[in-house]
Amino acid sequence: MSAAVAAPARTRLTHLQRLEAESIHIFREAVAEAENPVMLYSIGKDSSVLLHLALKAFAPGRLPFPLMHIDTTWKFREMIAFRDRRAKELGLELIVHTNQDGLAKGVGPVSHGSEVHTDVMKTQALRQALDKYKYDVAFGGARRDEEASRAKERIVSLRNGQHRWDPKRQRAEPWHLYNFKKRRGESFRVFPLSNWTELDIWLYIEQENIPIVPLYFAAERPVVERDGQLIMVDDERFPLEPGETPQQRQVRFRTLGCYPLTGAVESPAATLPEIIGETLAARTSERQGRVIDKDGAGAMERKKQEGYF
């Protein structure tokens, strides 16, 4: 009589493996349903993780969609250098779109303020690009833990013909089943990182050795303190107020955007383990440094309803 064959031990996925598997599943489901998908690439840590997951989802083949960056022309110089370097290293199709009307009118965060700048150079620019290339599914790196309006948005988010989000038209997503049925002109924003936290992102970056913009690591940088924020003076376009002089301080960024609208934090964290340690101890949102989130009550939800990322 032959000996009984032992049943294989049941493999348990780690927390990060479960998140990774869910994100890869979302990518594959969305691409299977999409007619013309695109990935919105904002260059930050979440976009870097999103890109890494997309490459895993479709390996060993090429990405079945391009990356698109909405360039306001006010991103940190290190962000643009990182974007171009990564696209070249990975052989990616990268589309860069800028609202030329806004650029011609000189719309910027300093001259027009954060609300007008964000609307013209981000929201309107994104709607222009989606219409121009006729994308019906746009992947984004938003996470539910970032901000209240993002917390209630579905993984597959229906947008109307003007790319607007209506919270009342959200669809149920039971058992990871996603509804991609749409009317003519409608489209979807898809968020594979919805269930990740800031800590998950940093742990995954460390585990997978994912390249990120150096601005996330602490270094001596020229900053001015304005309205309670440490703003890095990244180029000569930033006007100094009377008596204001940039000071070299040890800072890093928890989140990245247009540099005049993004506050740094004083920190000695120059390695991933140190950043993870700070994240574990943090008692404030990573978006505390985003000036655009302070454009009045419900600012982010209002922006999303107008077509924002």
From Swiss-Prot:
Pfam families: PAPS_reduct (PF01507). One of its GO terms (molecular function) is sulfate adenylyltransferase (ATP) activity. Its EC number is 2.7.7.4. One of its GO terms (biological process) is sulfate assimilation. Disulfide bonds: none annotated. SUPFAM superfamilies: Adenine nucleotide alpha hydrolases-like (SSF52402). It catalyses: sulfate + ATP + H(+) = adenosine 5'-phosphosulfate + diphosphate. It comes from the Bacteria. Gene3D superfamilies: HUPs (3.40.50.620). Pathway: Sulfur metabolism; hydrogen sulfide biosynthesis; sulfite from sulfate: step 1/3. Keywords: ATP-binding, Nucleotide-binding, Nucleotidyltransferase, Transferase. Belongs to the PAPS reductase family. CysD subfamily. Heterodimer composed of CysD, the smaller subunit, and CysN. PANTHER family: SULFATE ADENYLYLTRANSFERASE SUBUNIT 2. With CysN forms the ATP sulfurylase (ATPS) that catalyzes the adenylation of sulfate producing adenosine 5'-phosphosulfate (APS) and diphosphate, the first enzymatic step in sulfur assimilation pathway. APS synthesis involves the formation of a high-energy phosphoric-sulfuric acid anhydride bond driven by GTP hydrolysis by CysN coupled to ATP hydrolysis by CysD. This is Sulfate adenylyltransferase subunit 2. It comes from Methylorubrum extorquens (strain PA1). The lineage of its organism: Bacteria, Pseudomonadati, Pseudomonadota, Alphaproteobacteria, Hyphomicrobiales.
